[in-house]
Amino acid sequence: QGLTTVVNGNCGLSVAPAGEKFEKEIAGFLSSVTGDSKNRETEIMSTMSSYMSALQKEERSVNTGMLAGNGTIRAGVKGYASGKLSKEEVHQVWNVVEESLAAGALGISLGIAYAPEFEYDRDGLVEALQPLKGTDIPVTVHIRNEGDGILLALQEVISVAEELKIPLHVSHLKCIGKKNWGEMPVRVLKLFDQAAARGVKVDFDLYPYLTGSTQLVHLLPPQFQEGGTDAICARLADQSCRRKITKVLKQPSDIFENIVELAGFEMIYASTLHTEKFRSYAGQSIAKIAEQLEQDPYDTLYDILLAERCQVTMLDTIASEEDMLYFLKDSPRISIFFSWIN
């Protein structure tokens, strides 16, 4: 493919700087993305400087850069607890951001759709990113919602970049859900045009295919992801809590990215499964697995997450080829992105 450079740490999910207090929790949360670390000397690193030192010791065939994940930074300070940061915690975040940039991080990545970053509101993001104010240091972002609430999600991050006067890069732009195909991309690019006219530096990338990939636990509504893996598994083991989750997932939402409602279980595939019970179903859709198990697909989802302790990645067919081609024609702003390159 002619790749010369790999930039790690996207979507707020970087392996550094994790700090030391919540290192175990962060390692567990990221394990479905980072893979099995049993044969590695280390995986999650407390500081960006330690990551850079380890990187220099590796033989690499391509250039390598690193973004400091805002999700990892926040988790290193507060764990996966809900609520706003205290003043002391905000200052800790600032210190880690500054240390990471000084150590060689290219910028800061956000994953506002993921735990724990979905705890930030718009003003909380502005506060957390204060060390970048007025600089040319880029912020890349997996926006809060790529489905029904995509316009609100884009307005949120454009507003943050505009107030801080920093460059903004939107990661893997797409419009999820058939009801959002066709007209929505036109409205999305209009937002970019309006922001650029006001002097905001904003661009985006997309991958040239129709299937995305992320953690299967991301299907759960944000309020049911709070507290980290142990708390999530406790909820999934509770039948009354399962019913509450299902009730939310069956409704459209512009507050969170409800991929279950937007794509359907037929288009959501469990791509990595490790337990004896589910290993043979890897690569199959949740709907297909549920059919073979003769159970409701919602319960299949919860059973998989519980058995695998949320360490599952998924593939989800969510985009439109016509929309993809429309975005690709926006040559002044577009770059092509290939995800999950190992």
Label the predicted regions.
Residues 17-22, 120-122, 151-154, 181-183, ...:
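Short secondary-structure transition/capping segments
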Residues 51-55, 60-87, 93-114, 159-162, ...:
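Active-site neighborhoods of metal-dependent hydrolases
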Residues 48, 125, 154, 185-189:
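Amphipathic alpha-helical segments in well-structured domains
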Residues 5-8, 109, 140-141, 169-171:
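Short hydrophobic alpha-helical runs that function as membrane-insertion/retention elements
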Residues 99-159:
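Divalent metal-binding pocket/active-site signature
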Residues 41-50:
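Core domains of carbohydrate- and sulfate-ester-processing enzymes
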Residues 1-37, 41-42:
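Metal-associated gating/positioning segment near the N- to mid-region
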